[in-house]
């Protein structure tokens, strides 16, 4: 079968009054009964949302900062424990005698104090809490060094009748405080009083009074 072309020549005509069933198809002359209404829609600008990558990075950084603070606080706490141990040693009379009589003991104790200071210097002070704790422990160790130097600078044994100076005497020289000293012994009686007492004891009346023969 061959192809063919179809052309329509139909025309539609409506009533001239513009009224009727098909009056809405006219381009002009129709009355619009539905007027468009304007509705206001509020438009809000949403806040900038943080991308998932940025939120994850912030959480990782916060966790890492917390880890650093805990590690630095543990280092300061360890240095404080070492300072407490050295302070207890320095309060013992055996330690005082050892550091004053032996050069090696003196160097060993001094190196222990310097090692504590080096441990504190290795702790960074980025965070305020860690910085304040490190400063307090550093002051404590410096005070121990001053006491240690005062122990070494105490008077020799010859000034104390052959007995080394105690830590109480050293602290008395530093702070001007001393424990309550025992009262001095009473002076011996004069020779004349001793002779009179011996004569009284040798007399027969007193011997009879005390039950002697």
From Swiss-Prot:
What is this protein called in UniProt?
Answer: BAG family molecular chaperone regulator 6, mitochondrial
Q: Which GO terms describe its molecular function?
A: calmodulin binding; protein-folding chaperone binding
Organism the protein comes from: Oryza sativa subsp. japonica (Rice)
The UniProt record lists the IQ domain at 53-82
Q: What does this protein do?
A: Co-chaperone that regulates stress responses. Acts as a negative regulator of saline-alkaline stress tolerance. May participate in stress response through regulating the homeostasis of iron, manganese and zinc ions.
- Which InterPro entries does this chain map to? BAG5/6/7/8, BAG_dom_sf, BAG_domain, IQ_motif_EF-hand-BS
Q: Which domain of life is it from?
A: Eukaryota
Task: Name the Gene3D superfamilies for this protein.
Answer: BAG domain (1.20.58.120)
**Domain BAG as annotated: residue spans:** 75-152
SMART domains in the record, alphabetically? BAG
Q: How does it assemble?
A: Interacts with CAM1-1 under normal conditions. Dissociation of the interaction when calcium-CAM1-1 binding increases under saline-alkaline stress.
GO BP, sorted A to Z: protein folding
* Subcellular localization, as worded in the UniProt entry: Mitochondrion
Phenotype of gene-disrupted mutants: Mutant plants display enhanced saline-alkaline stress tolerance.
What is this protein's expression induced by? Induced by salt, sodium carbonate and heat stress. Induced by abscisic acid (ABA).
């Amino acid at each position: 079968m061959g192809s063919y072309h179809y052309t329509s020549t139909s025309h539609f005509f409506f009533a001239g009054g513009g009224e009727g069933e098909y009056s809405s198809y006219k381009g002009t002359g129709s009355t619009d009964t539905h007027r468009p209404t304007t509705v206001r829609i509020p438009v809000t600008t949403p806040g900038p949302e943080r991308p998932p990558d940025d939120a994850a990075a912030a959480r990782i950084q916060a966790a890492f900062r917390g880890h650093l603070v805990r590690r630095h606080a543990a280092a300061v706490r360890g240095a404080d424990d070492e300072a407490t141990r050295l302070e207890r040693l320095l309060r013992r009379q055996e330690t005082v005698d050892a550091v004053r009589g032996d050069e090696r003991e003196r160097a060993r104790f001094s190196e222990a104090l310097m090692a504590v200071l080096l441990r504190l210097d290795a702790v960074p002070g980025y965070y305020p809490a860690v910085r304040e704790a490190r400063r307090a422990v550093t002051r404590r160790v410096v005070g121990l060094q001053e006491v240690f130097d005062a122990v070494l600078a105490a008077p020799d044994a010859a000034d104390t009748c052959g007995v080394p100076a105690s830590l109480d005497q050293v602290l008395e020289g530093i702070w001007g405080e001393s424990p309550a000293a025992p009262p001095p012994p009473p002076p011996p009686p004069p020779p004349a009083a001793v002779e009179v007492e011996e004569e009284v004891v040798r007399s027969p009346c007193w011997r009879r009074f005390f039950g002697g023969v």
